[in-house]
Amino acid sequence: MTTKVAANSAAYEAIVRAGPRVKQLQQVHAHLIVTGYGRSRSLLTKLITLACSARAIAYTHLLFLSVPLPDDFLFNSVIKSTSKLRLPLHCVAYYRRMLSSNVSPSNYTFTSVIKSCADLSALRIGKGVHCHAVVSGFGLDTYVQAALVTFYSKCGDMEGARQVFDRMPEKSIVAWNSLVSGFEQNGLADEAIQVFYQMRESGFEPDSATFVSLLSACAQTGAVSLGSWVHQYIISEGLDLNVKLGTALINLYSRCGDVGKAREVFDKMKETNVAAWTAMISAYGTHGYGQQAVELFNKMEDDCGPIPNNVTFVAVLSACAHAGLVEEGRSVYKRMTKSYRLIPGVEHHVCMVDMLGRAGFLDEAYKFIHQLDATGKATAPALWTAMLGACKMHRNYDLGVEIAKRLIALEPDNPGHHVMLSNIYALSGKTDEVSHIRDGMMRNNLRKQVGYSVIEVENKTYMFSMGDESHQETGEIYRYLETLISRCKEIGYAPVSEEVMHQVEEEEKEFALRYHSEKLAVAFGLLKTVDVAITIVKNLRICEDCHSAFKYISIVSNRQITVRDKLRFHHFQNGSCSCLDYW
């Protein structure tokens, strides 16, 4: 008996020494078979765990099948390992085999399987696992519930995530973080911020994971005050400014209009990775500082920084497009394909078309798309949308109409394409065609996306939509805006009304333009603050008239006004914009 135990122990030590290396594990396995230990449950379990760690899935399954009656320990080993290694399909498959073998799962089983369902975004399967956990008596287990909050969040079911969270008898910091992250990642930034406040009221102290999600939520909404408080908290509490936190702070300051502060954070980071470099390059690009973006990209290459990836190249190409750096953009695109052997995706192609089109190289941009067409890559609507924007900018209306019609053929239910075609017709004076397009949109119930603008005043955020009258001080805001526009007209402002429906009188067009959401937001901001810069976040692109008006408003108010629209930043000061009207 002693000899058998010693042999078993020696075999176990041999497996441990082999580690997660497939060839050595296979040699040990062969030795076990020869020496009569090939069906030892404990030894096979260890072999299976290490084989799975080596991602040798086929070999793992072969070993698993050699066990005559797998028990709960063995099933949990493979389920936990496949879940941890992000092999969700295999994890779910072993869970199903476990059930068919009449082996009872544990809380660890459910936690791992639910995580895999989250990785797959498999809402229906995950709900089934949730029901099974409840029936099995693990519905209120702390680990299972925390995994369920993450699962429902990743599947976009925040109502389900909130219900699970609210039923938790004991809420952990992990569960709170999952809920904050879930709301933020599903675009519900305000809800994420509210959950953070509830977390603090419940006596939980935030950690780095909390702040990464919270900073992203602040960046979405433009809540710079809360974001700055987080930064100060990190400093005062002596928290480590790790890569994730540093990158989140760069994104916060960038998206809230302070690219200088973003660079300060970047320069103070002890450790950086490709995500941090890309975030800083993107910050320069969206603010119109294309040359700085290219210089930082060159520094990344020359100073032995991290190897740029596809996202990095999107950031630098976009920066070149916004700043009119055509030669630099061509060079970057060439280096991407030749030096780094990266395959450009739709985003890179869109940047190239946008860059060439904005700069007036319409023929080259059009040729670029047709070269992609020959390889079957020109069906992406975003390519033609970028080309259409260039046609509108350079008043090539005939080509614009052709492209707009092509877009409508690709996506007939996208109201944005119909609106762009209508605008092209309006600019070219074809009022009958404008009416035809608008009537067609009405018949097909195609509605233009509602625009809104957000402004933060005294640590509170306020949202405005076009013609908004929901604010308590609507009357005062509208009167102040009237005065503001009148003062702007005295120094040369003239409303740009070409794109407003041509069936109405000029006075009505001006009225329609006057109450755009960003104008209401800037009027409110100027009313409620003194001698401070105004920052507005808009969900759509700023229109040509508002862009013109804001240059004049910056003069009459003697304020700096920053607008973050769908694509970039505009910094208005003393009658000019940082984009140099190149947008």
Curated annotation (Swiss-Prot):
One of its GO terms (molecular function) is zinc ion binding. Residues 490-583 are annotated as: Type DYW motif. Residues 383-458 are annotated as: Type E motif. SUPFAM superfamilies: TPR-like. Coiled coil: none annotated. Keywords: Repeat. Pfam families: DYW_deaminase, E_motif, PPR, PPR_2. It comes from the Eukaryota. InterPro entries: DYW_dom, E_motif, Pentatricopeptide_rpt, PPR_At4g14850-like_plant, TPR-like_helical_dom_sf. PPR repeats lie at residues 71-105, 106-140, 141-171, 172-206, 207-241, 242-276, 277-303, 309-339, 345-379. Residues 459-489 are annotated as: Type E(+) motif. GO terms for biological process: RNA modification. PANTHER family: DYW DOMAIN-CONTAINING PROTEIN (PTHR47926:SF355), PENTATRICOPEPTIDE REPEAT-CONTAINING PROTEIN (PTHR47926). Belongs to the PPR family. PCMP-H subfamily. This is Pentatricopeptide repeat-containing protein At2g33760. It comes from Arabidopsis thaliana.
